[in-house]
Amino acid sequence: FWGNLRAKEEIIMKAVVQRVSHAHVDIDGVTVGAIEKGFLVLLGVWSGDSEGDCRQLAEKVGNLRVFEDENGKLNKALADVQGAVLVVPNFTIAGDCRKGNRPSFIKAERPERAVPLFELFKQTLAERGIPVQSGVFGADMQVSLVNDGPITLIVEKGDNSF
């Protein structure tokens, strides 16, 4: 019980979302995921994250209105523009650089818990009808993208957010 308590306003799960005109992820020179218009999402899973946190973050990302409407306002979501998502697992997002020059990754979730949450994030987006591609958890990946805008957002699921 006590291990699940979190400090007030503590960040739980985080996604770095970049609006892209296209993006792909390669492993050993082979493309394993690619999209055209949509989002490249670098997903960080924190120790103690829950399925509920994951679903809420995926819903938030899927509903982001950062595509231009006919008046040039950022008013359209992925579904409105037939966009896709390329999700790349990235434990380094949980890195803490406050002390010293070497990041601490102690807050990153262990792979045996993080992988199912990564898969749930993708599944939640797909259930909304959003095409999803992904990188591979634990792999050494090369990610290429053209950031459109540029628009880059950090979407965080904390105890008191959304």
Give the ranges of each region predicted by the language model:
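Compact, glycine-rich, soluble single-domain proteins
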Residues: 30-82, 92-123, 133
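N-terminal intrinsically disordered, cationic/polar leader segments
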Residues: 18-27, 48
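A short beta-strand-loop-alpha-helix capping motif that often carries His-Thr
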Residues: 75-92, 138-148
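Positively charged, low-complexity, intrinsically disordered RNA-binding extensions
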Residues: 105-162
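Short, Lys/Arg-enriched N-terminal segments with co-localized hydrophobic residues
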Residues: 1-12
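Residue-level signal for inorganic ion chemistry
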Residues: 57, 88, 151
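Flexible glycine-/small-residue-rich
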Residues: 19, 45, 89-90, 145-147, ...
